């Protein structure tokens, strides 16, 4: 008996039996599952191979890897594809240091992991107009990719200037004071507020897309700083590169000679463009993009100037009969976010936004080379007669519009030749275009070295 009693005491002390009070206790929590080991970082070549053949593909030496479907209908060629011919024509984009820097910024080999597990965050992004191709590209690419990468923790809600009752010239101020959180900014619209931004929108100065791209790539960092200073810390998240973004005159009456422009009331979307229009004897007028259709329909305007895809998106072919051009342009608008909105984002979400901004730029470079051809044809198919600029018009542009109107008037708007922006022009742009601005505001031809 003594041995049995001692054995019972030992069992009790060791927990070998339970009282009725402890018998129903919850089982111990299961051990957390071990974290999966982090996947080894991809090489850039492996990442490019995985993404080849469609949306999200990028170039590291083989343009054929970019060939494939566009990210959404109407954003590629006539078959909604990205074809090799268009890529080859704009190859300078992909071989540029700027493109290589975007690939690095996009962080394909070691993308930022999602850590944030709080409430979902929604940011409103404001396009100039949601009916035009660049806004559709934003919606199809950066909006969808951010939603997927953050598992819905960050969503971008697309709206537009017309929906918010905006015209565009005060966009920078609205970002500055937080009225707009995240928006598309086109330099021509805000030239009254920050004319320095028009340094890359000096119509007629850049003879082709490649020269204009070199200019844009050379000064984008400087322009980002201007925007940051003007918007109290606003940041450029992405650029809406459109290598198929030539401007055209959509007119009610036929424009066959330079004299036909005289006296015409022409919608302009920027100060430098207005100077170009005035050089031809026409009367430039700023009209909000969403209001141009009605102004053309009622005869308030004789012509409207915009890119082919934008005119088609707004159905200008219903109120005009002629499409005249092209005025060479590689349209580049910026996507700028309010400083506080960006700062308030969790660090991982913020970095994912930056990476997806770079990837959006890469996708824009992939799909837009076809846009001039495809959207010009769509306007023709809608009933417009296409008239190319005559040699006379090109001569007036070269010898009158640019040297007498566009460049001198821009110099005046930025405060004269003794300004930082003119010095930037001479340092970074003059060697590309072969034209230097002198101390008295005149210009001198210089060797093209870049």
Predicted regions and their residues:
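Low-complexity, polybasic segments enriched for Lys interleaved with small residues
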Residues: 28-29, 33-34
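Alpha-helical transmembrane segments
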Residues: 5-8
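Bacterial lipoprotein signal-peptidase II cleavage site
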Residues: 15-25
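C-terminal motif of bacterial Sec signal peptides marking the signal peptidase cleavage site
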Residues: 10-13
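Acidic/polar, low-complexity intrinsically disordered N-terminal segments immediately downstream
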Residues: 34, 39-41
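A gly/proline- and charged-residue-enriched helix-loop-helix capping module
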Residues: 207-228
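N-terminal secretory/targeting leader peptides
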Residues: 15-17, 42-206, 210, 236-450
């Amino acid at each position: 008996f003594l041995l049995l009693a001692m054995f019972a005491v030992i069992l009790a002390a060791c927990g070998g039996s339970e009282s009725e009070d402890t018998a129903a206790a919850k089982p111990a929590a299961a051990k957390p599952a071990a974290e999966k080991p982090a996947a080894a970082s991809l090489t850039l070549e492996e990442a490019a191979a995985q993404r080849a053949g469609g949306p999200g593909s990028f170039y590291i030496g083989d343009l054929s890897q970019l060939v494939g479907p566009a990210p959404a209908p109407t954003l590629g060629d006539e078959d909604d594809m990205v074809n090799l011919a268009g890529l080859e024509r704009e190859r300078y984009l992909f071989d540029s240091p700027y493109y290589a820097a975007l690939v690095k910024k996009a962080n394909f080999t070691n993308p930022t992991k999602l850590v944030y597990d709080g409430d979902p965050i929604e940011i409103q992004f404001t396009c100039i107009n949601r009916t035009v191709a660049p806004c559709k590209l934003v919606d199809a690419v950066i909006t969808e990719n951010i939603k997927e990468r953050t598992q819905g923790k960050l969503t971008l809600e697309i709206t537009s200037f017309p929906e918010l009752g905006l015209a565009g010239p005060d966009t920078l101020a609205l970002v500055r004071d937080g009225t707009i959180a995240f928006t598309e900014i086109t330099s021509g619209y805000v030239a009254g507020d920050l004319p320095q931004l028009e340094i890359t929108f000096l119509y007629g100065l850049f003879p082709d897309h490649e020269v204009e791209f070199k200019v844009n790539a050379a000064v984008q960092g400087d322009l980002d700083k201007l925007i940051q200073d003007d918007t109290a810390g606003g940041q450029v998240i992405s650029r809406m590169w459109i290598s198929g973004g030539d401007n055209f005159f959509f007119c009610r009456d036929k424009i066959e000679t330079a004299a036909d422009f005289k006296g015409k009331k022409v919608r302009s979307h920027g100060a430098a463009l207005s100077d170009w229009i005035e050089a031809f004897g026409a009367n430039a007028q700023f009209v909000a993009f969403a209001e141009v259709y009605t102004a053309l329909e009622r005869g308030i305007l004789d012509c409207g100037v915009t890119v082919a895809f934008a005119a088609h998106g707004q159905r200008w072919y219903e109120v005009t009969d002629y499409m005249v051009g092209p005025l060479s342009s590689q349209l580049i608008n910026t996507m700028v976010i309010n400083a506080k909105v960006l700062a308030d984002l969790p660090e991982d979400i913020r970095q994912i936004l930056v990476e997806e901004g770079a990837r959006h730029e890469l996708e824009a470079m992939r799909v837009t080379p076809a846009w001039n051809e495809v959207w010009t044809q769509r306007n023709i198919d809608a009933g417009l007669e296409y008239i190319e600029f005559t040699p006379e018009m090109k001569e007036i542009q070269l010898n009158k519009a640019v040297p007498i109107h566009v460049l001198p008037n821009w110099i005046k708007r930025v405060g004269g030749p003794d300004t930082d922006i003119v010095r930037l022009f001479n340092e970074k742009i003059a060697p590309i275009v072969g034209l230097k601005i002198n101390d008295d505001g005149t210009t001198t031809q210089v060797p093209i070295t870049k």
